[in-house]
C-alpha cells in the first residue's frame, strides 16, 4: 500500500494545483455518469492518471489504482482489507486519527 497525504500538514496549494483544479471544475463533467464530452473527458483523464500511477509504481494494471475521497476513507479501506476482527495492530501517536 502506498499512502499519500500531506494536506493536513502543508500550507496552501501551489498555483499550478489551484489552476489545475479550476480547469477541471470548468471543463470536466461527472466521469462515468454521462456520454457528453465533459464526462468523457473526465473519464479519460482519470484513466490516464491511473496509467501514470501504475507505471510509476510498476503495478502492471492501471485498474489496481483506487482513488478515494479522503485519507480516512483510504485508511479504513486498507485497514479493513488487511486485518480481521481480533487481529492485533500496534500504532503510534503519530498515526492518522482514523487509525
Language-model features and meaning:
Residues 1-99:
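Pyridoxal 5′-phosphate
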Amino acid at each position: 500500500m502506498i499512502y499519500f497525504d500531506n494536506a493536513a500538514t502543508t500550507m496552501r496549494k501551489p498555483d499550478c494545483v489551484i489552476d489545475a483544479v479550476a480547469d477541471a471544475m470548468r471543463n470536466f463533467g461527472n466521469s462515468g455518469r454521462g456520454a457528453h464530452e465533459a464526462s468523457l473527458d473526465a473519464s479519460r483523464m482519470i484513466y490516464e492518471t491511473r496509467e501514470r500511477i501504475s507505471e510509476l509504481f510498476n503495478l502492471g494494471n492501471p485498474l489496481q489504482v483506487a482513488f478515494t475521497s479522503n485519507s480516512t476513507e483510504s485508511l479504513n479501506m486498507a485497514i479493513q482489507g488487511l486485518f480481521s476482527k481480533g487481529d492485533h495492530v500496534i500504532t503510534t501517536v503519530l498515526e492518522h486519527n482514523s487509525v
